[in-house]
């Protein structure tokens, strides 16, 4: 019997902050399970979830607006600790009898708050001391409104010159509010405050660890599928790879992985996937060479969104054909992770805007009646990687830079041709190899090469050549929602350019993309 790793759990109500998923990841890092729900949940849903504590996230709205989001009143009647962050503090103050109004000055960025009263939330936590010995905390503010009167049964714990109620608390009810973001690294003691709330005030044990998550997932898979056969589309990406390893541990030879080589992969990637999972780990793998089929379907298509849809459609067709060849397969496994679940829920409630369509196994043939196995659906990406390491997957594979589902199909601009893909593969491999050699690969968040469908004149020896252009792209980011272009050394860029032009016959010019996100996206298509 495996331990119940969901026994102690935190509920996070999302009011729309860009940092809300980060709050959840921080709670998980503390070894405690949590879930992220939209703010408008019902009392019955909260009761059913039975949280050990509740966190109210930040958000972009103003509590002074009539129809702005509010926490369900039951949150304050459930008898569990509540922690309001930024907007979460404001709605807590307002709903419990305090007052909020728009501030004359919007506070955004670094601030230092002075602790003026003792509280379980910050006791013994400090970054510095005032001249008269009061603790100071370095925090990250991001708010326009501010609490101007706290509820009558609360006390002021900390303040700044422009924000009189930076932390408020009702110790008896274990309600706490902070007007800053403890989840971001700029709030230097933020993790200690979250740990104090989750582990000490809510009394949650650290049961959510990679080894225990694996044991739990294996037990759940076995309980769900029994002796049935399962099929998985293996791409070699982090999510499908960790899904494959978990299923292999749980059901062994009852798992069949279908690896579709679409001709849009990185250099030698197909061989590496087959060697690792087939030869090294001993998984059942069906290898489907399908380059011609994908490239035929893409012929003549220039529109990025149409290309994504074609690649997704052909993948499903090929995968379905292979699935139908297998006997007695009852289950389809997918590498869905928790942010996918959150995004789907947001889309269903009309709270998300699709910028690019996501690429996944989009459907099953109607004649196939299969159940769905999603062993990673409770996990964030960083947790998936930690589990992969625990399962024996190599670090370099798990911490590789992100690669889009449609692969080179969206890194070749315009029409996708085999010639373009082959040139791009080799140029990209040189860029990545040089990044690793210069110890720069792990210093950038994502790096890749883009094929531009334009010819440029060049000189090679005594002759002129009229060949293709590629662009190098490297960015630095924490969350991929915003990104800065990486300031790579000029001599490094020169070395990469020389190698590509000299070693890849067909490329005459290399450029470097210096666009940030926004306004540009990280990928070109």
Swiss-Prot record:
State the UniProt keywords alphabetically.
Answer: ATP-binding, Glutamine amidotransferase, GMP biosynthesis, Ligase, Nucleotide-binding, Purine biosynthesis
Question: Where, by residue number, is the active site?
Answer: 86 (nucleophile), 181, 183
Q: EC number(s) on record?
A: 6.3.5.2
Task: One Pfam family, please name it.
Answer: GATase
The GO molecular function terms of this record are: ATP binding; GMP synthase activity
Indicate which residues the UniProt annotation says bind ATP.
235-241
* Residues annotated as domain GMPS ATP-PPase: 208-400
Pathway membership, UniProt: Purine metabolism; GMP biosynthesis; GMP from XMP (L-Gln route): step 1/1
The EC class name is: ligase
* Reaction it catalyzes: XMP + L-glutamine + ATP + H2O = GMP + L-glutamate + AMP + diphosphate + 2 H(+)
Instruction: Give disulfide pairs as residue numbers.
Output: none
> Can you give the residue ranges of the Glutamine amidotransferase type-1 domain?
9-207
GO terms for cellular component = cytosol
Q: What does this protein do?
A: Catalyzes the synthesis of GMP from XMP.
Q: HAMAP family annotated for this entry?
A: GMP_synthase
Q: Which PANTHER family match?
A: GMP SYNTHASE [GLUTAMINE-HYDROLYZING], GMP SYNTHASE-RELATED
Quaternary context: Homodimer.
Record's protein name: GMP synthase [glutamine-hydrolyzing]
**Lineage per the UniProt record:** Bacteria, Pseudomonadati, Pseudomonadota, Gammaproteobacteria, Enterobacterales
